[in-house]
Curated annotation (Swiss-Prot):
Keywords from the named record: ATP-binding, Carbohydrate metabolism, Cytoplasm, Galactose metabolism, Kinase, Magnesium, Metal-binding, Nucleotide-binding, Transferase
Source organism superkingdom: Bacteria
Lineage summary: Bacteria, Pseudomonadati, Pseudomonadota, Gammaproteobacteria, Pasteurellales
Primary location: cytoplasm
Stored Gene3D superfamilies: 3.30.230.10, GHMP kinase, C-terminal domain (3.30.70.890)
Protein name as catalogued: Galactokinase
Ribonucleoprotein recorded as keyword: no
UniProt GO molecular function: ATP binding; galactokinase activity; magnesium ion binding
Encoding gene per record: galK
Family as reported in the entry's similarity comment: Belongs to the GHMP kinase family. GalK subfamily.
Residue pairs linked by disulfide bridges in the UniProt entry: none
Organism: Actinobacillus pleuropneumoniae serotype 3 (strain JL03)
EC number: 2.7.1.6
Length: 384
């Protein structure tokens, strides 16, 4: 059963009446451009056909009752009182979004009953948290008929995750969940929020292979990577690493390396990765899948060697996928790192070959069974 149907059904069972409306917000996969978003750089993700559905109805008071179907837990809070953190981690994503919506729209106090469910695998690097934030943001916007654009809802989601949940994420995940387009990857300039849609080439599929090694950004190494990037930006005297050209980096690389080896390696990844994203857009537009595959491979190598966020299981998955796909297409780790998924752009006629190569080898080598998802690029958050 799809999340949209499950949310509607479980809402009725839980609350004893039918939901008025349902919102769906997709997860995302990032084709190329990793950890560049919080460096004001470029990313090239697409929204995917897995996501979070929220069924909801207005109440005649200011209380939100939120039923999390997948874990059978409920949270309740009053919009007419200051919103405090909950002991349930999932509930803080909801509370955080509502809190920061109220900062922008102080008159918003509309109560509601909500039931939500997701088919985005948790801790997979496919943005289950952004899908949750954007679905809640859109729900609040509809409930209060609030004058918020989709980009504003995305930035509120990011704010909630940064300040209320405590994960120092960039804005890519939320922007993609809010602004995704059917059959398109979207290059996002994470500073200007300008979007360049580019069609997924005909005859190619997006395969996502989950290593089933879980990652946890809040307690992981994500925040230290961010600090190392900020150190490097300060070294170059710029607002963010996006402002450093490859030539400027080369000029002072030895000096930075002598001062802070880790900051040097992190900056090397970010600056080269921004360049790869810009070249990837050109490659896609030219339907040059050999070039795109090379850029994806370069991105993975840089994440492994310079940003140091891959793990052996992920590196092995990427090696298997690259062998199976060949030159026309590519594979790389996607998401924050330390587990999660790889993304592949694969010719349709090689999808089953890829699936078989992975199935025959990955579990044998690692002792972990992978999960294989074929995805389509889809629209961002919408009412159903």
């Amino acid at each position: 059963m799809k999340p949209q149907q499950l949310a509607t059904q479980k809402f009725s069972e839980h609350y004893g009446y039918s939901a008025a409306q349902t919102v769906f917000a997709p997860g995302r996969v990032n084709i190329i451009g990793e950890h560049t978003d919080y460096n004001d750089g470029f990313v090239m993700p697409c929204a995917i056909n897995y996501g979070m559905a929220v069924s909801f109805s207005k109440r005649d008071d200011s209380v939100w009752r939120v039923y999390a179907i997948d874990i059978d837990e409920q949270d309740e809070f009053d919009l007419s009182r200051p919103i405090e953190p909950s002991e349930h981690k999932w509930a803080n994503y909801v509370r955080g979004v509502v809190k920061y919506i109220q900062e922008k729209c102080p008159e918003f106090k509309q109560g509601a009953d909500l039931a939500m469910t997701s088919d985005v695998p948790m801790s997979s690097g496919l943005s289950s948290s952004a899908a949750l934030e954007i679905s809640i943001g859109k729900t609040a916007q509809v409930l209060g008929d609030l004058p918020l654009s989709l980009a504003e809802i995305a930035l509120i989601g990011q704010q909630a995750e940064n300040k209320f949940v405590g994960a120092n994420c960039g804005n890519m995940d939320q922007l993609t969940s809010a602004l995704g387009q059917k059959d398109q990857v979207i290059m996002i300039d994470c500073r200007s929020l300008e979007i360049t849609p580019t069609p997924v080439p005909h005859g190619y599929s997006i395969a996502i292979i989950n290593s089933n090694v879980k990652h946890d950004l809040v307690t992981g190494e994500y925040n230290s990577r961010r600090q190392e990037c900020e150190f490097a930006a300060k070294f170059f005297g710029v607002k963010a690493l996006r402002d450093v050209t490859p030539a400027q980096f080369i000029e002072r690389a030895a000096e930075l390396q002598a001062e802070n080896e880790l900051a040097y390696k992190r900056a090397k990844h970010i600056i080269s990765e921004n360049q790869r994203v810009l070249e990837a857009v050109e490659a896609l537009q030219a339907k040059d899948m050999v070039k795109l595959g090379q850029l994806m491979a370069g991105s993975h190598d840089s994440m492994r060697d310079d940003f140091e966020i891959t793990i052996p299981e992920i590196d092995y998955l990427v090696e298997l996928a690259q062998v199976a796909i060949g030159k026309n297409g590519g594979a790389r780790m996607t998401g924050g790192g330390f587990g999660g998924c790889i993304v592949c752009l694969v010719p349709d006629e090689k999808v089953e070959h890829l699936r078989r190569i992975i199935a025959d080898n990955y579990e044998k080598q690692t002792g972990i069974k992978e999960t294989f998802h074929l995805c389509t690029a889809c629209d961002g958050v919408h009412l159903i």
